[in-house]
Amino acid sequence: MSSSGLYQAVREEWKSLKKSEIYDLVKKRMIEWRHGPSIVRLEHPTRIDRARALGFKSKDGFIVVRSRVRRGGSNREKIMGGRRPRRMAYNKLTRKKSLKLIAEERAADKYPNMEVLNSYYVGEDGLYKYFEVILVDRSHPNIFNDPHISWISEPQNTGRVYRGLTSAGYKVRGLRTGRKGSSKSRPSIRSNGRLRR
């Protein structure tokens, strides 16, 4: 079987995961993931088709990390000071970032010498969502000598995940669409609000 045929087969298995033969294996793995640490460096990607499509290469300078994030909305400590009821909210608060972006940021915190290239979903249970994050060592010779990925070593791409420059960051900022209705997203939601004052 060619590599493209293999990736296609893996993609089809993950598309209909609950009907697939690997579902029981994934469920068993998620039980282990739930009780393990929240960020784990992996030897190989779990979904080789997604990793390759998003730029992963099996060579020095690239690593894959599994990141675990708690599902659901956000909450904060109960406010004890006085205020009107509308401003006392402490649960059912919607996050301003996606869980995927939070997973990327946590992986970047764990490996400060590396840049986040991209990430993909690998599963969820009742409590957590799991993502695998592709990280690149910006100072590795394999990286800055590779014409396809050397751009990540340039200074303007340092800390890109914290500035919303990954795919998940673009989506959260509303920059995926360029059609009618997206005018308030540019140059950013915050600065657009300032310009309109």
UniProtKB/Swiss-Prot annotation:
The answer on whether this UniProt entry bears the keyword Iron reads: no
Under InterPro entries, the record lists: Rbsml_eL15_core_dom_sf (IPR024794), Ribosomal_eL15 (IPR000439), Ribosomal_eL15_arc (IPR020926), Ribosomal_eL15_CS (IPR020925), Ribosomal_uL23/eL15/eS24_sf (IPR012678)
Annotated coiled-coil segments of the chain: none
Nucleus as a keyword? no
Entry's Pfam families? Answer: Ribosomal_L15e
Keywords, ordered alphabetically: Ribonucleoprotein, Ribosomal protein
> Cross-referenced SMART domains, in alphabetical order?
Ribosomal_L15e
User: Which BP terms does GO give this entry?
Assistant: cytoplasmic translation
Instruction: Please give the residue ranges the record annotates as the region Disordered.
Output: 175-197
Q: Which GO terms of the cellular component aspect does the record hold?
A: cytosolic large ribosomal subunit
User: Which molecular-function annotation in GO is an example for this chain?
Assistant: structural constituent of ribosome
Q: Which family does it belong to?
A: Belongs to the eukaryotic ribosomal protein eL15 family.
Name of the protein this chain belongs to: Large ribosomal subunit protein eL15
